[in-house]
Structure formats: structure tokens, C-alpha cells
């Protein structure tokens, strides 16, 4: 060390020498400045290397390295408070587990924060703007909502008499509670009485040092006994003073004022109304959700006021992944004392989290690529291999989406597996995570294939599904029998290795730990897989500090029961909790810049269709498909070997084959920008899941639907199935099929439903319009398409904004034998659809048509209203006829 310090002194001396020379020899100013600059840069580089690489660096950082400082009675081994209460009662059986939120506007901040909290905890809710008429509150003999929330308490207090009486009656009859937030105001109130209640408020106060009422029956998730020291956020707090035994404080705080005595009684910031005054239980908040403790108290209030219907589980499972083991530049890797600290911290956490082990993700190629001291750290990890759990990262830390050759990908995985075997690392965890989550989502099929073949992977995780932000919307899915779990971030990244360089400083990190984002992530998610990196465990060891601190803080302030399990068990438990998430929803990779960076460069969103012909069946979709294919600027998908021209991706098992499979039907072309790709699948129209799936992948696609008389469509479908040899259709008359009861044999009911359900046009269109704006929907009159396809196609081109327009008049001609228009070939002949199209069937019986008129009456009436709402200037003639008493001849 003496030699290095002397070298630094020599550098300083050199600077002096250069300066002297400039003075003595009267060198030009430019040369002097250049020389001084070069020496300065050299000194900086030398000093940087000296500080980072020398033994002195560990001494420097050890002085600043943060240590967990969370202290509370629970961690000191004091007597634990009684276990969390069970809020369940028989009253919960009369209400649905749903919250009704009254907001001032749809864009108000607190209302949005309430909704986000509910979404994060997967609590169903409905938002209503206060001041309007009340929504329907009951369904038969059951209440639709378990709790009512008023973003602004005044909106409840000032509600008109009729609605207030109606709302209060509902609350009393179904034992439904109310949560209200006192709004901030420009005018400061002192001792103002709440309208109609023996409760008084003081507003616009600054407060500090919050505490909870340990005797409150509301506290379940939240643990009392501690003090949240320091000023509370904002200077517009409301405190409550009661004049009735129905009120009991839930939380207190003190005035944050120099002229206010600190020994005075604390002030109630959250108060419970037990319902002894007017028969309705309430919880009133004197501040919004900026204070982290209020978020916990709101969740507990929902649980209590709903009689347990909205209670959250208190079990939380945690897994901490350490990516990039053996990967990293020199000076960022682990040394022996870092590994010892890792083991010591793991042991302390195990006392708080049963089963906890750090989960190490390794890339074997970079083993022993550090300094001599860091290589000893690598060795020490392997000496303690049994004390951790392990997973394969990637042999060379390369992103899987960069591999176009699956064989090459498998070979690299095999190298990592062989490294594991050579060094005694377990290879049977069934878990893996790729570098930067590449290939997990958006899916790179080669990764899933290689994972199965080499590692028999059964579970992975990613932060990218459906998107990184907002974190509350991260979900899981299953693809190729591999469970993909949501992965959480903790505020630490590969470059955050020193506390003094942490963005926002230590205060920012502590804010996340002590009630902030990291704390809330664990509170809101029953299963937490966290991403960290090897570099976070060296130098200042920020990951050790972060996780030990947040776990202790959770123990201090919540009744959560923390535990840990291997990834496979976490995956199984996750999909037991959320089975509805097993089916993926494929999004558009080009709508997320992060997704584009981990998507193969050989793929392009220009391969996706610009518009969809969605059906329904037997309305002329095949004819439209044929006519569109004539257009020189329009291209359809390649035909499917199983379903002919229809891919049927969004509504069937093909969806699980993934985006790569779908895009393979739209081969890339040099003229992508000028080409209009489309897909036609007539089964999409009435598919319950199709609109959501289609919108996730193709949010800007145009939708084309063709509507015919639903009665005629039903009859045509029946005849279609007869021609194709359906035994049910051949054994039952059309009238028997459409009038079949719900007790009829299942095959008969299935045929009935396929005849009748697609004709409920308004119902299906409304589902599409809940995802797509009306401007992206074009409705074609099926009769007009049949009688005047040229004009119909010209209107469609205008809707699609295809220029220049293609003149169909010289490419379509009416064929009297077929009874419809056909394509004109180069030889001036007509090329018509096959024998299965345009068949002539016996006329429908009058009794069947009359039945269908009655059956579709409400649906057709709704369709007329919908068409008018969409701005349609003309109502189709067939729709007018179906709504009259005229019997079809």
C-alpha cells in the first residue's frame, strides 16, 4: 500500500513538473493545457483503478456498507399479540365479494389509487361517479356489494334524500359497511360537525408519529404495537373527535408543530363507527392513501366491513433469485467474505422465513473469470453448494432469442448442465430463468423446446408478462406445460452495488423497504419471486441489506406468515390460487419497446393482419374472402391444412400453439408496408374469449362482420350440418332442433346452440365493442353483399383506406346458374365457389320462422338500437322484415 500511495504522490509531482516546465520554458498555452489534461486523465484512471482494485477498497466500502436497523418488539422476542382475528360471519353469505367505489370523477387521484389497490389485491370492484343515480344494489335476495367506498366523504353526507335513504337501507338490510375519506379543503375547519353525526373534525393539520389501536377488531393483516416515527405525508390531514360511544379510534398521530405540546393525547386520524348510532358500520379516514399504513388499514377495513368476504390470505411465499452467478466484471463479483455474509444473512432470514434459501442462477462459462480474490469467492460458493438452491441461467449468458438454431441453443444448455454435474450443482430443480427474461415472453419457441429437452424445465418466471409496468398487472401463464410465474423487482439492478450511488440515496431505498414499493409488493402478492443479481451481494451487499430489512419490517407491522418453497411448488400453488391465468393472452411485441429488444430480429409485426373478417358462419364470409383475394394489394393468410382458409387461432386449441405458429401463416414479404394482410375465421364472431385475445395482439386491426337474417342463418347452418352428415341434424327436423329444451340430449342441445347463439348479433357485437372502438368495426349487410358485391367492396375499401381503389366491376360477374356473383378469370370466364356454396334448400316451415321471429325479437330490437348508436343511416331490409309479423314465403 505504501508503494501505491507513493505512486500517487509521484503523479502529483509530475503535475508540478509539467507546470514548472510551462513556466520556465515559456511553452505555448495550448501545449501546456494539453499536457496538463493528459496527465490529469492518466492520474484519474490510475486512481480509479487503485481505489477499486486495491485491498483498501474493501476498507473504504465497509465503512459505508448499510446494515439492517429495523427494530421492534416482535423482533426483540417480546410477547406476541393475539393472532389475527377471523372476520367471517354469517352475514357474508348475503353479499358478493365486490366493492362499490364512488368517485368524484373518473380521473380523480384518490379514486385511481383506491382502484389500483383493489386491482393489486385482485378484489373485484365497480366505479360510479358520485351524484348520479345509484346502480342496482341487489340481485334477487343478495347484495351485489360487500363494502361501499366514498373517495370524498362529503359526497355521502350531502347525497340527496332519496338516494341516501336507499343506500342506508341497503347497508342496514345486508349489513354492508361504508369506508369514507375526508377530503382536503382550502378552508381550515376547527370543531366542525359532520352533517347528521355526533362527530367533529379539524382539518388541514400536519401530523407525525402514527400509532394503531391494538384493541381494534379491524386489525387483521396489520399488526399494532409500533410507532411510524416521523412526519406523515402532506399537510392537509383531518382528525376526528367523537361525542358518542359508537366511535373508536383505529389510528392516532400527534401534531407536527413546534408550538404543540408533545405530551398531549394523540389525535384520531382513522376512526371506526361501530354502527350503534344509526345501524351502519363505517371506517373514516382523515387522509388519503399517500401514507403507506392507510393502504393496509383499508384492506383490513374491507375485510372487517364485508364480514370476511373480502379477507385476504395472510400467507406469503418468498423466493429470492440471484441471477448471473459467476458472471460479472472484475471488482463486481463475490469474494470469500461476501459469500460468508450471504450464508450468515440466509441463516438469519431462515429464522423468520421457514425454508428460505437463496436461489442461485449460474452461467458456468464465466467461472473463475474474476480477480484471484473473486475466484476464491467462486470456489467458496461451490464449497457450500448444498446450502443454496440452484438453477441454470445460460452457459454463456446469451439471450435465447438470438439463437435461430435450436440445436445450438441445446448445445449451450448442455454445456451448463455438464458444468453443474462436474461441480456437484443439483440439476433437478425444474426451474430456469433466461438472461434478461429473453424468450420467456414474448415467447421464443426454441427456448421452451430446448428447456424441455435438456433440463426438463417445468417452471420459469418473468417480469415481462404482460408488461413490466404497472407491476400490479403482472400475471402468470402456462405454455408447453411450463408454468411461467410473475417475477418481481426489488429496486436493485446489476449496476446498483454501492449505497452512495443508489438513485435517490439510501433514503430512497429505505422508503421502498419501510412501507414503500418493495414492502407493498410482498404484502399484495401471495407468491413473490424476486430478481436480484450476483453484483448486488458484493461490495456494499445491498441485496442482503434490502431483504433482511424488509422481512423484519413485515414482521413488525403485519401478521403475515412468511415462508419459502422450491420454484416447482410455488408454481403449483400459484395456479391453484389463480387457475384462470393458466391460459396465456398473447400481446403484440411491437407495442412494448422492452419486448422488441428480446424478440427475434427475424420477426416483424408487419406479418400480422391489418383486418379480420370475423363472421359469423353462413353469412357469406367465404365469398367475401374470395373477392378480397382478387385485390392486388390485399393478401390473406396461407391456408391451414386442417381448417382450409381459416386459421381459427383466437377461438380454439390453435391459440395455445403460440404467436410464432400464427405468424407462420403470414410469410414475410418485401412490400410489407403496402400490403394489406387479413385473416378470415367465421367462428370468431361469437367466441367468448376471441375479442379479448384479438385485441391483445391486434389492437389496431379493423373488424369486418357480415349480418344476415338470424333466422335464415340458423336454417342455413342446420342444412349445412345435414349435408356434412351430422347424425343429429339427419335425425331431427329443424323445428325439433331449434325448440329443443335444456333437458334434451347434449348433442341435440349443442346443435341447437350452434344454430341459435351466433344470431344474437347485438350481444356479440357489444362484446367486441367492449375492446375495440366503433371506428374499427365495419358491418356488411349480407343481402347487399349477395346482390351488389361491387358496391359493397368499394365501401369496404373506403373503410380500410386502401388507395388506389380497386375496380371490382370488371372482375365480378353474376352467374345465373349459381345464383350469385363469381370471379371473372383472364379467359373471360367465371370462377365460382365450390358445390358446397350457394346450395338451394327446401323453404323453412312457417312455424319455425314464426318461432325464430319471437326468439330473436329482443335481440333484433337491440341490434336496431346498436346500429343507430353506431351511426348507421339505413337499417337492413331483412332486419325490418324480421321485426314485422310478415311470414316468410
Give residue spans per PLM region.
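Short, low-complexity, Lys/Arg-enriched N-terminal segments of secretory-pathway carbohydrate enzymes
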Residues: 1-29, 58-70
